[in-house]
């Protein structure tokens, strides 16, 4: 049972030739043939169990790593921690209370559980969506507006934003505990069962509510994320082009001057951060200081710019791929259920006819997968998170200090190197103190 997937029904629970019931806010067919019913139930249990276990294990692991590993406590990871909590909440308060009543054809948990679970599920979906938006805006500020965003890119500000998203979500979803109730119905064997139903007083209110949810939980967040990640991708591509041109220019200058290319050993020290790992930049070695002291200011900056080009190029391409996956999977997981909700609110009969049975089960399952793919996208695909996982659990193979050396993260004490990814901001890069 999922609040966002509440396929609301105002009419009767029976529509020939197949009796349609809204059990636990899910459409199902009451008179399916026995072999087909058993086969579908087996597949449903298998898929639900797999997604449930993956979500619980993945999000629990994310929460554990982010809490126990001090170097993982960045601004971005604070949002990821909130996202993991909301995804875990969605899994725990959604999937069992959808699957079990679907199999039993009866909501057996009582009215209090019906109201509580609908409320928690609606809140978890809302928090997840708002966290995704907050992460996209935070990444936009860190990558596209690094100097301006430093004013508000702090852990305390992130905690305030997270607290606001949770409070706002709990407030928005207050209609669910108010209007969620158990509705009795008679099954084919003349036994009385219950459905957990979210019913507003009128069709107009239902349509308005579904339109409201469609806007604030899908359309508006989707547009914001597409725009934010689109601008980030554009900025990264500009940075890649700038890196390539700077590398070529620096190489030509070294060849023409007959100099030896120093600074190559420090390439990894200037690798751009993705915000998921916190690593102090090591002080320059004595040889590097001597090389820098014998060069002009412009030469130092050129070497710094060019030395990290290869590493930056790889890191930026990896970030772009991850951002594309984030946006695509967000729409893939949530577009079907939001579309079904709107269809259900405006054309109940047609929605019942086309969505009952397997289609709605697949749509619901697709929306549930969002709770398990987020840890994979944001953390498990990230090298720094894997290093944090290994540091948190000593039983895992330790990659050694070389695994984290030179991977500079986002520091908020002003001692790290801050550089924009675009050609317009490279001149602001400092190796001593943050720009003001």
Curated annotation (Swiss-Prot):
Keywords: Cell membrane, Disulfide bond, G-protein coupled receptor, Glycoprotein, Lipoprotein, Membrane, Palmitate, Receptor, Transducer, Transmembrane, Transmembrane helix
Gene Ontology biological process: axonogenesis; forebrain development; neuron migration
Listed InterPro entries: Cholcskin_rcpt (IPR009126), Cholcy_rcpt_A (IPR000596), CholecystokininA_recpt_N (IPR015276), CholecystokininA_recpt_N_sf (IPR036472), GPCR_Rhodpsn (IPR000276), GPCR_Rhodpsn_7TM (IPR017452)
Residues glycosylated per entry: 10, 24, 190
Pfam short name (any one): 7tm_1
Presence of the UniProt keyword Glycoprotein in the record: yes
Ranges facing Cytoplasmic side: 68-77, 138-157, 235-321, 382-436
Spans traversing the lipid bilayer: 42-67, 78-104, 116-137, 158-178, 211-234, 322-342, 358-381
GO cellular component terms attached to this protein's record: cytosol; nucleoplasm; plasma membrane
GO molecular function: cholecystokinin receptor activity; peptide hormone binding
Localization terms from the record: Cell membrane
Domain of life: Eukaryota
Extracellular-side positions: 1-41, 105-115, 179-210, 343-357
Membrane topology: Multi-pass membrane protein
Lipid sites, type S-palmitoyl cysteine: 395
Disulphide bonds in the chain: 18-29, 114-196
Region (Disordered): 252-280
PROSITE patterns assigned to the protein according to its UniProt record, in alphabetical order: G_PROTEIN_RECEP_F1_1, G_PROTEIN_RECEP_F1_2
Function: Receptor for cholecystokinin. Mediates pancreatic growth and enzyme secretion, smooth muscle contraction of the gall bladder and stomach. Has a 1000-fold higher affinity for CCK rather than for gastrin. It modulates feeding and dopamine-induced behavior in the central and peripheral nervous system. This receptor mediates its action by association with G proteins that activate a phosphatidylinositol-calcium second messenger system.
Similarity comment: Belongs to the G-protein coupled receptor 1 family.
Name of protein: Cholecystokinin receptor type A
Organism: Mus musculus (Mouse)
Originating gene: Cckar
């Amino acid at each position: 049972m999922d609040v966002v997937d509440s396929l609301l029904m105002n009419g009767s629970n029976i529509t020939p030739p197949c009796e349609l019931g809204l059990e636990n806010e899910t459409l199902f067919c009451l008179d399916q043939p026995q072999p087909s019913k058993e086969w579908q139930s087996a597949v449903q249990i298998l898929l639900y169990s797999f997604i449930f276990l993956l979500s619980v294990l993945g999000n629990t692991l994310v929460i554990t790593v982010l809490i126990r590993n001090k170097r993982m406590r960045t601004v971005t990871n604070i949002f990821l921690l909130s996202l993991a909590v909301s995804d875990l909440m969605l899994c725990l308060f959604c999937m069992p209370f959808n699957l079990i009543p679907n199999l039993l054809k009866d909501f057996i948990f009582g009215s209090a559980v019906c109201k509580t679970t609908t409320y928690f599920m609606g809140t978890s979906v809302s928090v997840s969506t708002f966290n995704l938006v907050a992460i996209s805006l935070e990444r936009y500020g860190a990558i596209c507006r690094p100097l301006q965003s430093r004013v508000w890119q702090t852990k305390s500000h992130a905690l305030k934003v997270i607290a606001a998203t949770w409070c706002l979500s709990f407030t928005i979803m207050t209609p669910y505990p108010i209007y969620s109730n158990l509705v009795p119905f008679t099954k084919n064997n003349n036994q009385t069962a219950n459905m957990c139903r979210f019913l507003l007083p009128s069709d107009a209110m239902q349509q308005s509510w579904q339109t409201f949810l469609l806007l604030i939980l899908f359309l508006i967040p989707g547009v914001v994320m597409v725009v934010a990640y689109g601008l980030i991708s554009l900025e990264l591509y500009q940075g890649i082009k700038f890196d390539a041109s700077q590398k070529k220019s620096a190489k030509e200058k070294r060849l023409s001057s007959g100099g030896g290319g120093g600074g190559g050993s420090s390439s990894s020290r200037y690798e751009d951060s993705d915000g998921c790992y916190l690593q102090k930049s090591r002080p320059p070695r004595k040889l590097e200081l001597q090389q820098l002291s014998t060069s002009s200011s412009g030469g130092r900056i050129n070497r710094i710019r060019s030395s990290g080009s290869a590493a930056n190029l790889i890191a930026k391409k990896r970030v772009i791929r991850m951002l594309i996956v984030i946006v695509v999977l967000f729409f893939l997981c949530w577009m079907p259920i939001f579309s079904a909700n709107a269809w259900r609110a405006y054309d109940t009969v047609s929605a019942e006819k086309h969505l009952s049975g397997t289609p709605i089960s697949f749509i619901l399952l697709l929306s549930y997968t969002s709770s398990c793919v987020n840890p994979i996208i944001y953390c498990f695909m990230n090298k720094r998170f894997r290093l944090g996982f290994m540091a948190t659990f000593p039983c895992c193979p330790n990659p050694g200090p070389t695994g984290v050396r030179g991977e500079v993260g986002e520091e908020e004490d002003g001692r790290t190197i801050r550089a924009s990814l675009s050609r317009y901001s490279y001149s602001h890069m400092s190796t001593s103190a943050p720009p003001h």
